[in-house]
């Protein structure tokens, strides 16, 4: 016997109408979900940056500006080709509203090219100025939070001059866009300020030794050595300098400022200097420092989750990216729904309009010509003493 429906035709029409209305009611909720793509280097040479960044992301809430938020986190393995594929997937398949990351300059440059052409905003966690300069083409959709090279370089030269240690400097940097960017900026600024560069050396992130380069530096007998590197590979030149008995000053960029760097370099790092984000020495900051409150708040949140002394300025950069997205989303939601070109464009515009926004690493003021937005307040000088960071006056 054939089973028939017990619903009469009017009842069936009513059921179909009710179902259609229910689906319409659900659709705006699904559409309103903010989807953020994240590309990090959690393996490879830059893993000491990407791992704490990922740990910070786990602290992010599931809601932004009253809307549900979904994160899709991908590992690029510190590889430009993988970062490119990740960006293509996030944009073309996942339809993300914004990308945070990648962790380092070379991968960020690759992602910015793709995302900018697709008109998807990017907040890079890397340091190279080339990510946002010049402000044209795809870079109009790119932002970065770490300070540009001139801010760090200026602080190093001020410190060297203040300590009366002479004016001859040797440099050694990784052969990537990060190292090249710092070298180019340093050459220009050093010349303007009357410093003499007596040696310029380079090495690859995967090189097992820099003995040849360091011997050339020691032969040049500089008053200071400035190392341009990111991640644990930055410890290699400083270890070699210590083993060769170099007695001058050694400076690093904040690209190496993490606990893995301290572990790998050990006692060879003692007495070295570097410019870093204030969050790394949050409790040591004077009360007058405008970022102290936000920096201490982040450190407490992060170390509650990861343990004492686990703080990381790279994690703090990821945290500040969230704070900025939260702020921008409030404005963007007034102009478009998540998942639409209007929302992505409004997000970009809201980030660009940021003014005196205090984060854990600095005070951000963006503009059409400045997609970095930080000033000298984003960097402090620290010295490595007894395996820890010590704020310098």
Q: What residue ranges belong to the model's regions?
A:
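Extracytosolic ligand-binding ectodomains
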Residues: 2-6, 17, 21, 32-393
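N-terminal signal peptide c-region/cleavage motif recognized by signal peptidases
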Residues: 26-27, 31
């Amino acid at each position: 016997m054939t089973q028939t429906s017990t619903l009469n035709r009017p009842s069936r029409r009513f059921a179909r109408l009710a179902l259609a209305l229910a689906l319409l009611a659900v659709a705006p909720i699904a559409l309103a979900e903010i989807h953020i793509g994240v590309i990090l280097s959690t393996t490879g040479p830059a893993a000491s940056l990407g791992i704490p960044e990922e740990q910070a992301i786990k602290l992010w809430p599931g809601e932004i500006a009253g809307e549900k938020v979904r994160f899709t986190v991908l590992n690029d393995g510190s590889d430009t080709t993988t970062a490119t594929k990740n960006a293509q997937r996030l944009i073309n398949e996942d339809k993300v509203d914004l990308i945070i990351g990648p962790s380092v300059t070379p991968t960020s440059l690759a992602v910015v090219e793709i995302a900018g052409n697709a008109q998807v905003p990017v907040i890079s966690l890397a340091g190279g100025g080339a990510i946002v300069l010049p402000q044209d083409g795809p870079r109009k959709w790119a932002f970065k939070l770490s300070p540009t090279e001139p801010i760090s370089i200026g602080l190093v030269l001020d410190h060297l001059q203040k300590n009366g240690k002479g004016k001859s400097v040797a440099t050694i940097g990784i052969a990537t866009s990060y190292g090249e960017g710092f070298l180019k900026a340093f050459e220009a600024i050093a010349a303007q300020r009357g410093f003499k560069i007596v040696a310029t050396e380079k090495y690859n992130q995967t090189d097992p030794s820099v003995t040849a380069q360091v011997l050339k530096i020691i032969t040049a007998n500089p008053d200071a050595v400035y190392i341009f590197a990111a991640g644990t590979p930055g410890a290699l030149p400083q270890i070699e300098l210590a083993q060769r008995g170099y007695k001058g000053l050694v400076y690093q960029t904040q690209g190496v400022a993490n606990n893995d760097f301290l572990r790998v370099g050990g006692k060879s790092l003692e007495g070295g200097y570097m410019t870093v984000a204030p969050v790394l020495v949050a409790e040591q900051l004077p009360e007058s420092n405008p970022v102290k409150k936000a920096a201490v708040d982040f450190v407490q949140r992060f170390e509650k989750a990861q343990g004492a002394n686990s703080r990381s300025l790279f994690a703090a950069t990821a945290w500040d990216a969230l704070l900025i997205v939260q702020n921008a989303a409030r404005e963007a939601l007034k102009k478009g729904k998540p998942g639409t070109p209007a929302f992505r464009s409004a997000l970009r515009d809201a980030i660009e309009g940021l003014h005196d926004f205090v984060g854990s690493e600095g005070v951000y003021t963006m503009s059409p010509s400045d997609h970095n937005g930080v000033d000298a307040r984003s960097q402090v000088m620290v010295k490595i003493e007894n395996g820890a960071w010590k704020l310098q006056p």
